[in-house]
Regions:
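Residues that define the transmembrane beta-barrel architecture of outer-membrane proteins
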Residues: 40-42, 57-63, 98-106, 145-151, ...
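Residues on the lipid-exposed face of transmembrane beta-strands in outer-membrane beta-barrel proteins
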Residues: 46-50, 63-71, 106-112, 125-129, ...
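Transmembrane beta-strands of outer-membrane beta-barrel pores
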Residues: 48-54, 84-90, 127-133, 171-177, ...
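Extracellular loop and loop/strand-boundary signature of outer-membrane beta-barrel proteins
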Residues: 50-52, 93-97, 137-143, 176-179
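Cleavable N-terminal export/targeting peptides
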Residues: 1-38
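Short loop/turn motifs that connect adjacent beta-strands in outer-membrane beta-barrel proteins
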Residues: 28-41, 69-79, 115-121, 161-164
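Predominantly the C-terminal beta-signal and adjacent terminal strand-loop region
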Residues: 37-39, 153, 159-197
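Transmembrane beta-strands of outer-membrane beta-barrel proteins
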Residues: 40-46, 76-84, 104, 121-127, ...
Length: 197
């Protein structure tokens, strides 16, 4: 009978540990599920920036729509979306450079969240296509094509009770990858604000 008490105590301790582990796992799963559900809604964004070279600069203002895609990897830490945007490029280059040019773009993006997908911080990147409504001139010459690749890389953070606000720093390179000469390209640094709805 002396051994019965320690055996019961060990069994009771094991039961408590199992309950505690199950509760913690359930809470962690619920938190992860809640966070993973957040990016699956559309958002609109505005951003502004300028080219990274010295001399005559090109400033850009953009309005865009982010549409979630149903692809994710690494237990939801990497999620995908589609950026569809309209940009105004304002150039200070000398004639024959056009003062304003409009860019239409579509870029599939992949976003990685830190801390097993639960962090408000993220990095993202993607490569897509864009179209300029007129030939764009840079200090190094004109673009050889109106159709270009658009490479995006960003880092940012979500805010708010439902993480509905987002601020990020974006780097974007636009060029035709040498498919048509000349190909000076432009690289922009931009600040973005997005709101999820």
């Amino acid at each position: 009978m002396r051994n019965a008490a320690p055996a019961h105590q060990a069994g009771f301790a094991a039961l408590l540990c199992t309950i505690a582990f199950s509760a913690a796992s359930g809470a962690a799963t619920a938190a992860a599920d809640e966070l993973q559900a957040l990016p699956q809604t559309r958002s609109i964004y505005v951003e502004a920036g300028y080219t990274d070279h010295r001399g005559p600069a090109t400033r850009t203002r953009t309005v865009g729509l982010r549409v979630p895609l149903q692809y994710s990897w690494w237990q939801g830490r990497i999620r995908t979306h589609l950026d569809v945007y309209l940009s105004d490029w304002a150039s200070t280059a000398a004639p024959p450079a056009r003062r304003h040019n409009t860019q239409l773009g579509v870029v599939p993006m992949a976003r990685y969240r830190f801390a097993d997908g639960q962090s408000p911080w993220f990095v993202e990147g993607g490569i897509g296509l864009s179209y300029l409504t007129a030939t764009h001139h840079t200090p190094n010459g004109p673009f050889g094509s109106r159709w270009n690749f658009s490479d995006h890389l960003g880092v940012g953070r979500n805010f708010g009770a439902q993480r509905q606000h987002e601020v990020s720093l974006q780097a974007k390179h636009v060029s035709n990858a040498g498919l048509r000469k000349p190909n000076p390209g432009e690289t922009f640094v931009q600040i973005r604000y997005a709101h999820r709805f």
